[in-house]
Design a protein with these regions (language model features):
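Hydrophobic transmembrane alpha-helices of multi-pass small-molecule transport proteins
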Residues: 127-144, 160
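Loop-to-transmembrane-helix transition segments
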Residues: 7-15, 62-88, 152-160, 199, ...
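Helix-helix packing/entry segments at the starts of transmembrane helices
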Residues: 41, 101-107, 174-190, 228-244
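Transmembrane alpha-helical segments that form core, pore/gating elements
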Residues: 24-27, 31, 35-36, 50, ...
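Hydrophobic/aromatic residues within transmembrane alpha-helices
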Residues: 29, 38, 42, 92, ...
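Membrane-interface helix-cap regions at the ends of transmembrane helices
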Residues: 47-70, 137-149, 192-213
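C-terminal transmembrane-helix exit sites in multi-pass transporters
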Residues: 89-91, 108-130
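Hydrophobic/small/kink-forming positions within alpha-helical transmembrane segments
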Residues: 16-21, 51, 79-87, 109-114, ...
């Protein structure tokens, strides 16, 4: 296995741990704050890892390079898909068992492999297609759509997985020499704006109650931002279909 693929897989595992920590906090906050407010706060504080990396590498000069019509379109599509994913997954975390939501969320690699064919022109062999079909069979086994225990909320993590996969695939369309932290910061700003606007339209924001909630919100953003940063780095290191 190529060294870059091994490194990318390791980075993704670290990102998965960060996402799990974020998910636990989202579940804790979900009974108090509207989901869109949680998404807006998560995206605001999710800028922290990107800012730290940009400062450490002294790469802030790369940010103006994002100001291109083509990159604006990619960023808007990525950000919109992420907001939909967050709304879907965060809602699921508050409505179904954490383990079930997490397991269904792991269907992301299935969508990444499938989407890499039309969007990136990758060739996926028969073994990977077989893995995709087996993966979908596993998703259906968990959901049990024709069982009495099925809940429509179980569809939400799968929608989230598809949207996160789309965002991950689109990151390959950025120039290879563009710093990953710059890409991530641009996306975090846009997702924060979109989630905040949606929150103001559909919900009344709830005041943050106490230092403990404030601390959880900051950690949620930091974990989430770290997780997404890991995905951006991993899928730029190696072909998404190979890593997935």
């Amino acid at each position: 296995m190529p060294r870059n693929v091994i490194i990318a897989i390791g980075v993704i595992f670290f990102g998965i741990i960060a996402f799990d920590m974020m998910g636990i906090i989202v579940r804790l906050l979900g009974d108090t704050y509207p989901i869109l407010q949680i998404a807006a706060m998560r995206n605001f504080f999710g800028m922290i890892p990107a800012l730290i990396l940009l400062a450490h590498a002294r790469q802030f000069a790369a940010l103006p390079r994002l100001n291109q019509p083509r990159l604006h379109a990619i960023n808007l599509l990525r950000s919109t898909s992420v907001v939909v994913a967050q709304l879907s997954f965060y809602t699921a975390l508050t409505k179904i068992e954490f383990a079930t939501a997490g397991a269904l969320g792991f269907s992301g690699p299935i969508f990444i492999t499938a989407l890499s064919v039309p969007l990136l022109g990758h060739v996926v062999g028969v073994w990977r297609w077989s893995a995709i079909f087996i993966g979908f069979a596993g998703v259906l086994t968990i959901m049990q759509p024709f069982n009495d225990g099925f809940s429509a909320y179980m569809v939400l993590p799968v929608i989230a997985a598809f949207c996160y996969a789309l965002s991950s695939i689109l990151v390959r369309l950025y120039p290879q020499d563009m710093p990953s932290a710059a890409i991530q910061l641009g996306q975090q700003i846009m997702t924060c704006v979109l989630a905040t606007l949606a929150m103001l339209v559909f919900f009344d924001p709830v005041a943050i109650t106490g230092a403990s909630d404030a601390g959880l919100i900051v950690m949620m953003g930091a974990f989430g931002g770290t997780g997404v940063m890991c995905l951006v780095i991993a899928y730029r290191l190696a072909d998404p279909s190979s890593v997935s």
